[in-house]
Amino acid sequence: MDCFRKVFRAASMKKARLYMTACGLYEAVINGQRVGDFVRAPGITDYRKRIQYQIYDVTTLLQDGENALTVQLADGWYRGSCGAWGLKNQYGTETKLLAQLELTHTDGSVQTVATDAGWDWSNDGPIRFAVNKDGEVVYANNVPSYQGKAKVTNHPVTPAASNNVPVTEHERLKAKRITTPSGKTVLDFGQNIAGYAEFTVTAHIGQKIKLRFDELLDENGEFTQKNIQCSSKKITTPLQQVIYTCKEGKNHYKTTFAIFGFQYVLVETDVAFQSEDFAAIAVYSDMERTGFLKAPTHFSISLLKTPSGVPRTTTPTCPQIARPANATAGRATRRFSSTLRHIFLTMHLLHRNMCGMCTTGRKKTGSCRKSPPTAVWISICPLWTEASAGRMRAC
């Protein structure tokens, strides 16, 4: 996990805008406050042909005098796991960050702070591992040292302004604590979502909390991930897990660079906790909603909630299958898109982005690929035998 920092001075500011993108996933912080609410920015594109940048108004985050802009950079789809078997380095082997902060002063002058070799860098922050669908490994006691310097690199693609709906956090679900027949502790959030977990506990330094995520319990009422995993002698994926090593005292954690499909969370820890200490956060595109449903049964409402929480940057798919969020998302697209158009006024923006991916991802012959954005070594047919990665049919 790359950690970048730029310390700069500013005064008499009228407005400030931050332009940022990455080959990978980024999260920016100014003076201790998160920049924007876009989750897993800049989103997924075919990085060889199209990279989208975001623009943030950061005027209120800055102060007269010294300021610090810090950025965490993860592999994301660019270098992280893609496809049912978690293939790596599909678009490149070196994550990259591009940023430009424009400060407009009250006298009309403009000050620019841009990524260059003067930025501080280190890879010793609290997040030790972060992969799309496999999860995160976190050492809460770690603090980035920023003892190194950033390396200047390039990418042969001109960034374009983001034309899509940002992915943001939405519903927060409460947990119900249950004990399986074998005595394991599982949290039931009552609804299958795409998202991640958050918790706040008091612990001693070195204590561990391991979380594993899945959509269902098996026929015996036990936690299982067999319905979503592909397994061989060398690899089992997706892991859908978080391994958190505590610091002394209060520990607050929320997943940063991974997303899971789940309703149930297996908790393995010696840290004392209550179900109220945990929450599940649904993550999907921040579209303007026009449709709601009141129904006499929980089943009817769940039928609406399921597709409502699916869209993330492209058309619907499920995160644990972990394709590169393909624009032609197959069965999920055909099943849910017509419903989503009635629920969300801005659903057409996702379809516009899908068409853009199909266009930029065309073959040299001019024909569209089956599942854009398609990386170098992976081309998965958007036809599924069942809603399970373990039973996926490849072309």
Features from the language model and the residues they span:
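Aromatic- and glycine-enriched pocket-lining scaffold segments that form the walls
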Residues: 330
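Well-ordered alpha-helical scaffold segments within catalytic/enzyme domains
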Residues: 336-347, 382, 386-395
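Generic alpha-helical structural context detector
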Residues: 339-342, 356, 360
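Short, small-residue-enriched loops and turns at beta-alpha junctions
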Residues: 327
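Extracellular/oxidizing-compartment recognition motifs
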Residues: 1-324, 333, 349-358, 364-382, ...
